[in-house]
Amino acid sequence: MITLSHYLVVAALMFVLGLIGIMKRNNLIMLFFSSEILLNAANVALAAISKFYNDITGQIFALFIVAVAASEVAVGLGLLILWYKKTGSIELSSMNNMRD
């Protein structure tokens, strides 16, 4: 039987994977993907805790996180497309020249 600790271990592994992706990548698209993995890890944890304690509050928070993540992707990718058109690069190091 799958217990709450199994879900929390999966959520923790997803969270660590997202943190490693944020720390190790220089590509802005990969940074977006890593931040989405972080948010999905929080969703898994909230939904699992909510199910095992028979409280719908965690699932409602997970729904709000999905909405925030969707808006983050829409705004972030729009800005990323504009940045690519301006500089021709999506590497993180190209953002050092934003003041110019």
Curated annotation (Swiss-Prot):
One of its GO terms (molecular function) is quinone binding. GO terms for cellular component: NADH dehydrogenase complex; plasma membrane. It is found in: Cell inner membrane. It is a multi-pass membrane protein. Keywords: Cell inner membrane, Cell membrane, Membrane, NAD, Quinone, Translocase, Transmembrane, Transmembrane helix, Transport, Ubiquinone. GO terms for biological process: ATP synthesis coupled electron transport. NDH-1 shuttles electrons from NADH, via FMN and iron-sulfur (Fe-S) centers, to quinones in the respiratory chain. The immediate electron acceptor for the enzyme in this species is believed to be ubiquinone. Couples the redox reaction to proton translocation (for every two electrons transferred, four hydrogen ions are translocated across the cytoplasmic membrane), and thus conserves the redox energy in a proton gradient. This is NADH-quinone oxidoreductase subunit K.
